[in-house]
Design a protein with these regions (language model features):
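Conserved beta-strand positions in repeat-built beta-propeller and related beta-rich domains
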Residues: 7-11, 49-56, 99-103, 138, ...
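Short loop/turn segments immediately following beta-strands, especially the blade-tip
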Residues: 19-24, 65-72, 111-113, 158
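Asp-box/WD-like beta-propeller blade repeats and closely related beta-sheet repeat scaffolds
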Residues: 73-134
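Repeated scaffold domains used in trafficking and secretory/extracellular systems
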Residues: 35-41, 85-89
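An edge-strand/N-cap motif at the start of beta-rich repeat modules
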Residues: 1-21
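Structural motif
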Residues: 13-17, 57-63, 106-108, 153-156
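Residue-level detector of Asp-centered blade-edge/turn motifs that repeat once per structural unit
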Residues: 1, 42-45, 92-94, 139-140
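Loop-centered beta-sheet repeat module
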Residues: 141-158
């Protein structure tokens, strides 16, 4: 059995590593340098990555890559701002890519839409503001679910 794996490294001089796992052996196939990749997902023959702090206003970026047959990554366009600070999680849902912006407490859609959470949680020292940290489809793929540590809440989007 052969599996293709992508790992991101946010360290200095980091980037995205492509490995092949075959017969229990892991082999590096390619390396794509990029600025502080935080989280990656693959959707069909595309790879999406959150870039930690790639704009002058310190917002995170969302970069799309085409995965070539060799596993090499080819960038598609330039990074797009997630309109938030410290994006930390991605998911694909109904043809769009969504990013959770941790410090901004918001959800960004690749269509350009932004939903900002408001309020605070019951623990003022830890929950002074929204901290959106996860986004994923519901198990039946009818809804988009988002968790927010700062509000101690789960949001459901349809």
């Amino acid at each position: 059995m052969t599996a293709s794996l992508f790992f991101s490294s946010c360290a200095e001089d980091g980037g995205i590593y492509h490995y092949i796992l075959q017969n229990g052996k892991l082999t590096l196939r390619s390396f794509t340098p990029c600025d502080r990749p935080m989280y990656t997902i693959t959707e069909k023959k595309q790879l999406w990555v959150i870039l930690r702090d790639c704009f002058d206003d310190h917002t995170s970026g969302l970069q799309e890559y085409k995965i070539l047959d060799s596993g090499t990554l080819m960038p598609i366009g330039e990074p797009v701002s997630t309109k938030g600070i410290v994006a930390c999680h991605l998911c694909g849902f109904h043809g769009k890519i969504y990013a959770a912006n941790y410090l901004s407490g918001s959800i960004f859609s690749s269509s350009g839409a932004l939903d900002v959470h408001n309020g605070h949680g019951v623990h003022p020292s830890r929950q002074e503001a929204p901290h959106t940290h996860f986004i994923a489809p519901s198990p039946d793929r009818k809804f988009l679910l988002s968790t927010d540590l700062g509000l101690d809440s789960i949001f459901v989007y349809d």
